[in-house]
Structure formats: C-alpha cells, structure tokens
Amino acid sequence: MIIRRFRLLTVLLLTAVAHAATPLLPLEVFFGNAQISQLQISPDGRYLAMLQPVNNRMNITVVDRQQGTKRRLTNMREENVVSISWLNNHRLGFRQQVNGQESFGFYAIEADGSKLSVLQQLVALEGETVVNQPEQQYSLVDALPDDPDHILVSINRGRSGLGDLYRQNIITEKFTKVMTNPGSVRSWVTDRTGLARVGISQMDKAPTAEVLYRAGAKSPWVTIHTGAVDGDEWTPLGFDGDNKTLYVRSNQGRSTAAIYTYDPVAQKITGTVFADDTYDAGDIIYSRHLQKVVGVSYEGEKPAIYWIEPTMKRLATDIDAALPGMRNDIVSATRDYATVIINSRSDRDPGTFFLLDTVKMELSTLLRVNERVDPAQMAAMRPVEFKARDGLLLHGYLTLPAGREPRGLPLIINPHGGPYGPRDSWRFNPEIQFLANRGYAVLQINYRGSGGYGARFEEAGYRQWG
C-alpha cells in the first residue's frame, strides 16, 4: 500500500495534477442541497414526512399515502428545518435553525398543515449568550409514544442547566409539572413508559458526577454510581423492555468502551452485551415492536450493527442481500413494524430511501437523496491501517480518483477536527469526492487523540500538539 510508510509522499506531492478519467463535475454536484433528507413514516403508515429544499432552505413536505397527495407544510425563507419526528399518527414535531448562528426552536403541526403549535420559541445564541432572553431553557426528554397528546420536556427556570420535568400538550402548548429536579440533574433517562428513572447529576465545575436512580414514581432517588468527570466513562443508555434492566456504556477496566447490562437495584453489572478491543461501542438499538433492545451500533472500519436479536439479524441480512455493498439503516418504522423505511448509502452514494413491506418482503424505491450524484463517477473510500514510527497502529481512509491508475497522484492529507474526540468515518463526503474528482488522492488519518478507538488511543495524543 502506497501509504504504508509514506515513502512516496514527496513524489506524490511534487507530481502535477493530471486530467481526471471522469469529467470535472460542477460544484453543485458536491455541495448543492440534497433533494431530500430525514424521510419518516407515521406510526400508522399513512404519511411520509421529509425535508426538501424550497427557497434555498430546508422545508417540510408530507405525502398522504392513502389519498395519494403531497403537501408542503412550511415555507421558511430565513430559517432551516433541521429535524422532524412524528409525535403521533398525524402530528409532526420539527426543529428550526437560523443560518449563521446557533439557534433552536421546537414546533408541532398537523399532517395537513393545520394547528401549528410553538412548543419552544426560536432562541438565538451568540456564543454562550442568549440574544432574546427566553423565558425558559427547554429540552425534549421523551416523545411519549404511548401518549399521543403529550411530550416530556425539561424546563429550566432560573437555574442554569438544571431543569424540572413537565408534560407538555403538543396542541395547546400547555405545561403540567411532573417532577422537581431532585438535585443537580442535567440529563435524564426514561424507562419505556416515559417515566424518568435515571438522572446524571453534576454541580457547576464539580470534579465528580453522580448517576441517580429510582425504582418507581414514588420511590426515593439513590446514587448508583459516582465517578470523576474526566475519568472512566459510565453512561446509562436506556432500559430494556422489562423496565428493570439498564444498559450502560463504560470503559472501566479496559481501554475501549463496551456495553453492559446492569441491575440498578443490586447495583452490579449482570452481563456484557458488546465489547471490541479496537473500537468503542456506540449506542443501543431498541425495538418498540419487539419491546426489547435488539442491537448495538459501533464505528469499525465501516459503520456497523451488532445484532443480539435473531429476528432483526435475519431481517438485516435479507436487506443487505437485496442492497449489497451499501450501509443499510432502518431509519423509520410503523408501530407494528409492517412497513419500514431504509436509507441505503455508501462512500460513493449519498443515499436512496426504500420502503420495505416486512410482511410480503417487498422492497420499493422511494427517493434518492441527491439526483445530481452519479455513484459511478464517484471515488471509493478505502479503509487503511499502518503503524507510526513508534509502533502505534493508526487507521484511516484513502480515496483515489475514479478511473485513474494509482501512480504519480498528488496527495492531500485531510485531517479531521478536534483534535480529541472526533474521527473520520466511511461515508459519502462531498469535500473528499470533490478533491478526488479534481485528480487528487486524499488520505484521512484517525491520528492519535481521535475518538472511537478507546481511552488509551485518545490519551496517546495528549501533550503532542503545538
């Protein structure tokens, strides 16, 4: 491999750029707005909601599958809709953001475009300063899928970052207080009924954090874990369907983070769900239909899922067989799981949305994310690994111009940001594809300090900068 010891680096950098085998493509191919993103099916399967560009801003479009009609719900000209989610069979929640500054707002609207509710006003921030002084700081804790009229939110009134819990009506916007913050809880974990059962508590600038737990709505809060903020990870991820077993991600006693089952009553680990010596575990995947945790996501050479539930593993295998060579994610599903939406994408393809009937096992194409991109004209992103001078194994990705001999190519080394925490991943990257289209080889290295490879790998980058 040409990058094994960088022996050809000087030659590559001094070589002139030759004409690419594929045509030079317009900038819009790489950097124009996607034609569609975040396609979501309603719980009953009647509606499809998506984001599409209108007025050079991302707006909401809803398709009524029963009536065969299509309707644009928003007409943003200054702001972008950045995320959507179904709150019940016919009501959609969405977040709004203004370009050029950090900002947020949360709204709900009917699938026919009626009854717009402002669940959280648009709040503009400049750095850490709130520009328009909101009455409250607001965060969504649980969408309460079994309560079609309400969501669970955290609202801070007067205490920085420390919110109390409220049930909010998604039509009237009204709040009903559910619980006062038991201390300094900054984030919550609910069980599968929507009851807050775990909280991560930390005082301002305190060196330690506590994980609090309660057995039920009337039970006292008890501390089940205490750890240093800059120490080993111990993160509660969510409950299983029995609302007793807690899943936690931790790297205690190891370098990479693993996922375990945990008994919060006995306060002990009960089993290992996923552990890898090279890569950190990601998050758990919960199936509302099966009412259990079914898998674990993680970032290896390519994004992957470790399935622990046989039914889901078989379904994923069938999908991958129908769409080979792609990253195939189930991004939305009906409540009964009879219909699922798949986003199928790769290093050369920004993606296509498919609809799968899981009863008949029939797959149909819905929409491509970006019609301007021809995957055949894009370059492959190859996972690579090599040892540094001190013997540390490094991982990365090499992208070579499509249709070119891998000889005499100018090389761009494109490091990710950070330096600690982020990493590069196998995906469609417009910037990398643009450079490859212009005739450059591009090397992305997950250098020491990058995230996803365990604590020791990140710590190997400490005091190595400047």
Residue positions per predicted region:
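An N-terminal hydrophobic leader/cap segment in hydrolases
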Residues: 349-384
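A generic, residue-level signal for flexible/boundary positions that often mark functional hotspots
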Residues: 24, 67, 218, 360, ...
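Cap/lid segment of the alpha/beta-hydrolase catalytic domain
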Residues: 372-466
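Beta-propeller folds
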Residues: 8, 12-15, 20-340, 345-349, ...
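N-terminal secretory signal peptides that target proteins for export/translocation
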Residues: 1-4
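Internal amphipathic alpha-helical segments of the cytochrome P450 catalytic fold
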Residues: 57, 256, 350, 363, ...
